Swiss-Prot record:
InterPro entries linked to this entry: ExoRNase_PH_dom1 (IPR001247), ExoRNase_PH_dom2 (IPR015847), ExoRNase_PH_dom2_sf (IPR036345), PNPase/RNase_PH_dom_sf (IPR027408), Ribosomal_Su5_D2-typ_SF (IPR020568), RNase_PH (IPR050080), RNase_PH_bac-type (IPR002381), RNase_PH_CS (IPR018336)
Protein name in UniProt: Ribonuclease PH
E.C. number(s) listed in UniProt: 2.7.7.56
HAMAP family referenced in this protein's UniProt entry, alphabetically: RNase_PH (MF_00564)
Keyword tRNA processing (UniProt): yes
Transmembrane region(s): none
Subunit field text: Homohexameric ring arranged as a trimer of dimers.
Organism the protein comes from: Actinobacillus pleuropneumoniae serotype 5b (strain L20)
Superkingdom of origin: Bacteria
Protein family (similarity comment): Belongs to the RNase PH family.
Binding of phosphate, residues: 86, 124-126
Keywords: Nucleotidyltransferase, RNA-binding, rRNA processing, Transferase, tRNA processing, tRNA-binding
Molecular-function GO term, any one: tRNA nucleotidyltransferase activity
Pfam families, sorted: RNase_PH, RNase_PH_C
Amino acid sequence: MRPNNRELNQVRPVKITRHYTRYAEGSVLVEFGETKVLCNATVEETVPRFLKGQQQGWVTAEYGMLPRSTHSRMQREAAKGKQGGRTMEIQRLIARSLRAVVDLKALGERTVTVDCDVIQADGGTRTAAITGACVALHDAMSKLVADGVLKENPMKGLVAAISVGIVDGNAVCDLEYVEDSNAETDMNVVMVEDGRLVEVQGTAEGEPFSHMELLQLLDLAHQGINQLLDAQRKALAL
């Protein structure tokens, strides 16, 4: 039996709280069970140097974990003086996922940065961050429209992500930490509303997985992400 007596294909309870902080143009607290991530979207009227004069905008992301978001305290990366490889990989993944659903030309020459800070980690922090960041980004874009800066929302749709894996020989959806740390195969899947995939990250930690198992995991992810997309639409009243 899975933790919390979940079925193999069952997603943890998902909660998306909008307008969580005061100052950011878009602010969301997203909760996947006991995993909690704060996602704040900031709009700046500038673009990176490589986009100067290109008549388009940019969407980027940063990711971090609070020192006591895990079972034992981690040292802040700022105290170490550099970001770790895992952090850089995750924030690039978040940014790529968000750009997949934004018309950068329609955004104009401005940058939206989404800061994703893990308050509490119990597996799936990057997938929760992507799912929450999308809602925060949507709110930031909607504010640009409401303020008369843009005529239309540049977002082309929604994007969400979930973890799947093989634990004790079973394909499971939305892994908690205890499952993730014991998984034979661990995979993160990012998908947009029409079912197309943005990214698939899959690794066999123990035995290699078969082609059939890959298809089974992708099917589980598709089911789970559709539930997350429904939660996003409900939160945004779309």
